[in-house]
From Swiss-Prot:
The lineage of its organism: Bacteria, Pseudomonadati, Pseudomonadota, Gammaproteobacteria, Alteromonadales. It comes from Pseudoalteromonas atlantica (strain T6c / ATCC BAA-1087). Residues 1-19 form the signal peptide. Keywords: Cell inner membrane, Cell membrane, Cytochrome c-type biogenesis, Disulfide bond, Electron transport, Membrane, NAD, Oxidoreductase, Redox-active center, Signal, Transmembrane, Transmembrane helix, Transport. PROSITE patterns: THIOREDOXIN_1, THIOREDOXIN_2. This is Thiol:disulfide interchange protein DsbD. Its EC number is 1.8.1.8.
Length: 592
């Protein structure tokens, strides 16, 4: 309902339209799932030896596992290596590549000629392999150290050289490869800038648009394009800096920080703020600084220009802090990298580029919005009221984290009815044109959809519940603490059952979507028929919950874990972010 209402409003205003919204499973290819597994250092046992001017690197490969020849890469510092000497492998058709790949089974040795090296010269060896059953590992790096080897006469003096194999990398490993590989910083930033542009068309960034629009509108009808650009750019800088700094905090604090921001008191304050902003847009009251303050700012800041920039920067920072509840795959990948390494500079830079990419459409929207603002007449009021409804929609996004699904669904229905009713009245007052007919059609569709959504919520609830009685998922076993979890896990394994652990919080919208749409589905219930369902409530920042987060290395919610019959978490099985029932059922069948 909320997406339909928002989309219809945007069509009426002809400002922008949202791209199709994918669920977290659009990034599912970044994470592999495999029921039986070995750790990467067990699947591919690494060893090396230096024989004079040759470095021989060897891998003992477990049965039913293999390494890709084209994924071997060596980067040396204070040394120079020649072209690697590979043995002949086997050609394999692999779903992750467009053409057959040469792979190695059981054991492989690769020889690197050492053209020149110093004592303790370092060489980073990177490799990547898969299991026949379907699990593929991210690229893995080992560091080896060399003894001194004198350079040949025809060798040019160089401090650093690299020998690498060419070949495509499957999409599953692209993000990990960007951060762990040796691409230039500029290339990494460009990639994440592009990812950010894609994220700009998701619900995470939706609240930014009405906020930025309100800032542009607040500058008056005579705002210039350059002024609109500067305001939009400053706003985006505030947002980008917030995401970058927040990312570093989240990487170290995990869900604790996210939970603090989602405390009911803070959410309630945000709801009030956006509701008041909506009233301002409706013209119910004026929001401005006291006249004495305005006079001082006018005198010091040349009619508030500097003050406005600072205010816009702060608004962008606050917006980035409170209006992005989603945990996306690119953001999660960067945060995991920061948390597991000491390379904060690269992590911060990648986060900033990602955030800046998210801001590019915002800047374009701010400029376009400034141009499209009516110079005079009744349409100015219609635009302001429209953004008022958008402010209410943002407030509702926070409300749904505090109340039941049924209550929020009814509120969405009412908001849609009120919004489209207002547009109906305004459209009736306009002159008869082709555009009026088109607007009327969109308005009636919006009214009908809003009414049906509310009807289905109120009167369809009973039949919906009744229809799912026999398909209700097993009752979750509530886990109190880590000791309780270990006991319940052991008890489940003793019964020959695997375990699924749902980590959720009351403020987590996607957690509620799992509960409403995914868990009750027949496919999911059948796929987890021999699995004990456990649940950990991370709503509050208690010492017990912090221990859970640290023990399981939780970055965001929802997170769902799977444990095998030996009580170990299944490699690559974690689900982060909402997943639809069919995809979740397939995921469960693949790993259990």
């Amino acid at each position: 309902m909320k997406l339909i209402a928002s989309f219809s409003i945007f069509m009426l205003m002809s400002i922008w339209s949202f791209a199709s919204l994918g669920q977290s499973n659009s990034f599912d290819s970044l994470f592999s799932n495999e029921p039986e597994f070995l750790k990467v250092d067990q699947a591919f046992v690494f060893d090396y030896v230096q024989n004079g001017d040759q470095l021989v690197v060897t891998w003992d490969i477990a049965d039913d596992y293999y390494l890709y020849q084209q994924q071997f890469k060596a980067v040396s510092k204070n040394a120079s290596l020649g072209e690697p000497i590979f043995p002949t492998g086997k050609m394999k058709e692999d779903e992750f590549f467009d053409e057959p790949q040469e792979v190695y089974y059981h054991k492989v040795s690769v020889t690197y000629p050492i053209l020149q090296s110093q004592d303790d010269s370092a060489v980073k060896i990177r490799y990547q392999g898969c299991a026949e059953a379907g699990l593929c590992y991210p690229p893995t790096t080992q560091v080896v150290y060399l003894n001194a080897v004198n350079a040949s006469d025809d060798l040019s003096n160089t401090d650093e050289a690299s020998v690498e194999s060419s070949g495509s990398v499957s999409q599953q490993f692209e993000l990990a490869d960007l951060l762990t590989g040796d691409q230039s910083l500029i290339w990494v930033l460009l990639i994440f800038l592009a990812l950010g542009v894609g994220l700009a068309f998701t619900p995470c960034v939706f609240p930014m648009y009405p906020i930025l629009s309100g800032i542009v509108i607040g500058q008056g009808k005579s705002i210039s394009t350059s002024r609109a650009f500067v305001l939009s750019f400053v706003y985006v800088q505030g947002m980008a800096l917030t995401y970058s700094l927040l990312g570093l905090v989240v990487a170290s604090a995990g869900v604790q920080f996210q939970a603090a921001l989602q405390h009911p008191i803070i959410l309630g304050a945000l709801i009030v703020v956006f509701a008041l902003l909506a009233l301002v847009m409706f013209g119910a009251w004026e929001f401005q600084l006291p006249s004495s303050w305005q006079e001082k700012l006018n005198g010091v800041s040349n009619q508030q220009k500097s003050g406005s920039y600072l205010g816009v920067l702060l608004m962008g920072a606050i917006s980035g802090l409170v209006a992005s509840p989603c945990t996306t795959a690119p953001l999660t990948g960067i945060l995991l990298y920061i948390a597991q390494t000491s390379d904060l500079l690269l992590g911060f830079s990648a986060l900033y580029a990602l955030s800046l990419g998210m801001g590019i459409p915002l800047i374009l929207f701010g400029i376009t919005g400034g141009k499209l603002l009516p110079k005079a007449g009744a349409w100015m009021n219609i635009i302001k009221v429209t953004f008022g409804f958008m402010m209410l929609a943002v407030a509702l996004m926070f409300v749904e984290r505090l109340v039941s699904h049924m209550a929020t669904d009814i509120l969405w229905s009412l908001l849609g009815l009120v919004t489209f009713s207002y547009f109906y009245v305004m459209n009736q007052a306009s002159s008869v044109t082709f555009g009026k007919g088109v607007r009327a059609l969109v308005i009636f569709i919006g009214l009908f959809a809003s009414a049906m959504y509310g009807y289905q919520t109120i009167f369809g609830q009973t039949s919906s519940v009744a229809g799912h009685t026999e398909q209700s998922h097993p009752r979750f076993e509530v886990v109190k603490n880590l000791d309780d979890f270990e006991q319940k896990l052991a008890a489940a394994n003793a019964q020959g059952k695997t375990v699924m652990v749902d980590l959720y919080a009351d403020w987590c919208v996607a957690c509620k979507e799992f509960e409403k749409y995914t868990f009750p589905d027949t496919q999911v219930v059948d796929a987890l028929s021999n699995t004990v369902w456990m649940q950990i409530d991370l709503t509050d920042n208690t010492a017990t919950n912090i221990a859970f987060q640290e023990h399981f290395s939780i970055l965001g919610l929802p997170t769902i874990l799977f444990f095998d019959l030996q009580g170990k978490e299944i490699s690559g099985s974690r689900v982060t972010g909402f997943m639809q029932a069919s995809a979740f059922a397939a995921h469960a069948k693949n790993i259990l």
